[in-house]
Amino acid sequence: MANINFGFDHHAKKLYSGAIENSINSQLVPMVIETSGRGERAFDIFSRLLRERIIFLGSPIDEHVAGLIIAQLIFLESEDPERDIYIYINSPGGSVSAGLGIYDTMQYIRPDISTVCVGMAASMGAFLLASGTSGKRASLPHSRIMIHQPSGGAQGQETDILIQAREIEKIRHLLEDLLAKHTGQEVSRIREDSERDRWMSAVEAKEYGLIDQIFEKRPAPKSEE
């Protein structure tokens, strides 16, 4: 039996080697104290952001992370199917299957999805950034965005390796087709540009069609204008 793994994991592991243990799950998560007529109540920062319909993707993407993101998306749709959901992305990418699970859920639920790159959206992170609702995909000015082809490795019998190679090629075609759909680029250009790591600034990502806007400063509330 072949020992097979493929996806965007290689890039994520390369960037985060020695640092994954310091991911968001193992850090001290800040608490927010909220005061109401019933007294004080403490929330972890991510639960508090979720109340504002904000999801933070700040780690490599694996099945566990995907499960959490998918659950939050479905919950927020059940709370209000008409209000936008905001996903802030700072991720080096990760598993294709896990990322596609998030992608399919983003397309499936009713609310518009606003995606924002804060820091880096690479590999599957860039794919999810581009997959937000058209007109509602953004980046902060000094973020970096990177696209590339899926990588994979297999060992075992020759027939198993050939089967896996064909599967990787199918996945590559699928991702190229979807990225072309969301960016407006030709599939042939997506294939050429993703042959190797293609890094972009926020301005370049906007020109490419990965995002629609560059946020430099949050607008003041209307009452302050």
From Swiss-Prot:
Swiss-Prot/TrEMBL GO biological process terms: protein quality control for misfolded or incompletely synthesized proteins
Record-listed E.C. numbers: 3.4.21.92
Annotated GO MF terms: ATP-dependent peptidase activity; ATPase binding; serine-type endopeptidase activity
One Pfam family hit: CLP_protease
SUPFAM superfamilies in the record: ClpP/crotonase (SSF52096)
Catalytic activity: Hydrolysis of proteins to small peptides in the presence of ATP and magnesium. alpha-casein is the usual test substrate. In the absence of ATP, only oligopeptides shorter than five residues are hydrolyzed (such as succinyl-Leu-Tyr-|-NHMec, and Leu-Tyr-Leu-|-Tyr-Trp, in which cleavage of the -Tyr-|-Leu- and -Tyr-|-Trp bonds also occurs)
Main location group: cytoplasm
Annotated localization: Cytoplasm
GO CC terms: cytoplasm; endopeptidase Clp complex
Active site: 123 (nucleophile), 148
InterPro entries: ClpP, ClpP/crotonase-like_dom_sf, ClpP/TepA, ClpP_His_AS, ClpP_Ser_AS
Alphabetic keyword roster: Cytoplasm, Hydrolase, Protease, Serine protease
Gene3D superfamilies: 2-enoyl-CoA Hydratase, Chain A, domain 1
The protein's assembly and partners: Fourteen ClpP subunits assemble into 2 heptameric rings which stack back to back to give a disk-like structure with a central cavity, resembling the structure of eukaryotic proteasomes.
Role, per record: Cleaves peptides in various proteins in a process that requires ATP hydrolysis. Has a chymotrypsin-like activity. Plays a major role in the degradation of misfolded proteins.
NCBIfam families assigned: clpP, PRK00277.1, PRK12553.1
Family: Belongs to the peptidase S14 family.
Entry protein name: ATP-dependent Clp protease proteolytic subunit
